[in-house]
Regions:
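Generic structural signal for well-ordered, non-transmembrane alpha-helical segments
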Residues: 48, 52, 148-151, 312-315, ...
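Alpha-helix capping/hinge segments and adjacent helical runs
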Residues: 374-492
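Glycine-rich flavin
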Residues: 70-209, 215-229, 234, 239
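FAD-binding core of flavoproteins
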Residues: 159, 164-306, 471, 475-491
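N-terminal-proximal low-complexity accessory segments that begin disordered
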Residues: 3-58
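Extended amphipathic alpha-helical segments enriched in small hydrophobics
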Residues: 305-363
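N-terminal low-complexity or amphipathic/hydrophobic leaders
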Residues: 39-103, 365, 459-461, 470
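Short, charged, amphipathic alpha-helical segments
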Residues: 337-341, 369-377
Length: 492
């Protein structure tokens, strides 16, 4: 994968931030927030800042073109490296660097920037052979064609892979008479019709297209629920119902993260939505519904993206803890150093896992370069515990200082002189100290911080399930042999 700098003469498919924003106006999407129908996020004060952040993400690839763009294998135009199917260890390393740059722009707070699904569909297209099983050659061809469209149009996409939580003790087809979960209700020569709901479409207000693919196994008799496809956000019959916004026209001083990085989550309603068959990847194949996740290498590739972002987010947390401890002078205490050391351990173990996965990577049977997923399987069980625990450590490092945080209106108001005197710290003046503590509180204690903690606990499934799975699939031969050598000794 060659990389290149952009110039005015360099053909590129990579969009700018302005092109991204213009693209959001191109459809009649139906986004609902607090009972209000919204057609464009820039037109709504609670969504506008995150739209601008997303535009910044698109601009970033041009500012770092040498690291984030590479020639398309089809026509040589420059595209984001996360769109490309990795064919070498170097491709994985370059992809990680591009993901890291994107994550750094949002302190790792936005988990669903476009690189997430770019990596997913590059993986899917690279293993079209898995999608083609049991006579689904057309679905496989559609996956390949759609991935090229994502790449060449530089789309921002969202996905929704779980059905609503009606009665988790039952299969989807038996919950609410089978009418709530997304399912096929009709078919013509050119399209299928789907009805039901899915959750959660993170990034929905800022996406060009919605993708649907498997999130869990499905019973053989539930073929109407075994679906994978992609459609534009403005497709008739699609409705996106958002949770509360955490932006709320907040000051970037008072809420430096919430004001900019709320990527939003939405439930998707499909009101007899027509899906063109050239956008249909899988329909009715309940075996394939599992295999396109288990046999394409998706888990290893998506964990490569996820833990790169987690590395950045953990590094940000380490920076917060380090600066708070030095600002207030508590860094001299051993128990504070121990807490900071714990965060550093998490940062370094995550970095080491990424490097190890790349160093042990190899070519899979489909010709895609696949990261060694063993380090990722270990991290997948621990990361949902680490990130919430980091919040606890930061609380213990900052203590009551998180409550001594006047707003920017106070700092600029009639009490400015007193605030400057009484809010100073050993290592910073009052304004810097207040900025730092408000930033950290937005990370650990605001509504965005709470959403982030919940997200980190569950977005790659829950910790106990992943830890149990890691044990189940782990190679235990060497460990077992160490014990067997003693058990098989002749008594002396």
């Amino acid at each position: 994968m060659a990389t290149a700098e952009t110039t005015q003469e360099t053909p590129t498919a990579a969009r700018t931030g302005q092109q991204f924003l213009d693209g959001l106006r191109g459809d009649a999407r139906e986004i609902w927030l607090n009972g209000e129908k919204i057609t464009h996020p820039l037109d709504h004060p609670q969504l506008a800042e995150a739209a601008r952040t997303m535009a910044r993400v698109f601009d970033l690839q041009h500012e770092h073109a040498g690291e984030m763009l590479a020639p398309s294998p089809d026509d040589g135009r420059l595209v984001n490296v996360t769109h490309l199917i990795p064919r070498s260890r170097g491709d994985l390393e370059r992809r990680r660097r591009a993901i890291e740059l994107t994550a750094a722009a949002t302190a790792g707070m936005m988990g669903r920037t476009p690189d997430y699904l770019n990596v997913t569909f590059a993986c899917f297209a690279g293993r079209a052979d898995v999608w083609a099983r049991r006579g689904n050659e057309q679905g496989a061809a559609n996956v390949v064609a759609y991935q090229k469209e994502m790449r060449d149009r530089d789309l921002s996409t969202t996905h929704s892979i779980m059905n609503p939580q009606v009665d988790r003790s039952k299969p989807e087809a038996e919950q609410a008479a089978g009418e709530v979960a997304l399912h096929k209700v009709g078919e013509t020569e050119n399209h299928i019709t789907v009805r039901g709901a899915r959750m959660l479409a993170t990034l929905a207000p800022y996406a060009d297209e919605l993708t649907i693919y498997p999130g869990s196994d499905i019973r053989p008799q539930d073929g109407n629920y075994a679906l994978a496809f992609a459609i534009p956000m403005g497709t008739p019959g699609l409705k996106f119902i958002c949770r509360d916004s955490y932006s709320k026209q907040r000051s970037t001083f008072d809420y430096p993260l919430s004001s900019r990085f709320d990527e939003m989550d939405a439930v998707v309603i499909f009101d007899d939505v027509e899906v063109p068959k050239n956008r249909l990847f899988l329909c009715g194949d309940t075996e394939g519904y599992s295999e396109v996740i288990s046999d394409t290498g998706w888990r290893g590739h998506i964990m490569h993206q996820a833990f790169t972002r987690a590395y950045v987010k953990l590094s940000f947390a380490l920076g917060l803890g380090h600066l708070i401890a030095n600002t207030t002078g508590v860094v001299r205490f051993d128990h504070i150093q121990e807490k900071l050391g714990q965060i550093w351990n998490m940062v370094e173990l995550t970095r080491s896992g990424l490097v190890s996965a790349e160093a042990g990577s190899s070519l899979d049977e489909g010709g895609v370069w696949y990261p060694d997923d063993r380090p990722f399987l270990a991290l997948r069980g621990e990361m949902p515990k680490w990130l919430p625990y980091v919040n606890e450590l930061l609380q213990l490092i900052g203590g009551g200082g998180f409550m001594a945080t006047p707003s920017v209106a106070d700092i600029q108001g009639p009490l400015a002189e007193q605030i400057e005197k009484y809010y100073q710290a050993a290592g910073a003046d009052a304004e810097r100290r207040i900025r730092l503590f408000r930033l950290a509180w937005d990370y650990i204690g605001s509504d965005l911080g709470g959403r982030g903690e919940l997200y980190e606990r569950f977005y790659l499934s829950d910790s106990w399930r992943m830890t149990a799975l890691a044990y189940k699939i782990a190679d235990k031969a060497f460990a077992e042999s160490l014990v067997e050598q003693f058990l098989q000794e002749q008594p002396s």
